[in-house]
Amino acid sequence: MLPGNEQLASTMNIQLNGETTQLPETITVADLIERLQLSQRRVAVEINEDVVPRSQFPQRHLHPDDRVEIIHAIGGG
């Protein structure tokens, strides 16, 4: 570890909507939604082909190499 970087969190890679994304190791689904500025939108989240209920977003931690798909509803006519 480089001097002065003691407070940097360890990171991991996940697949987010098909793209490799580097995130802190301790991130939850709720944290990710907030980071993506989607917290005010209606979203559906799937991790490794399993749908995650919105009620579990705050408790569901992501893990290295998870495959995450996030979709959000867009109104239209």
Where are these regions (language model features)?
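Ubiquitin-like/PB1-type beta-grasp interaction modules and other compact soluble beta-rich domains
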Residues: 1-76
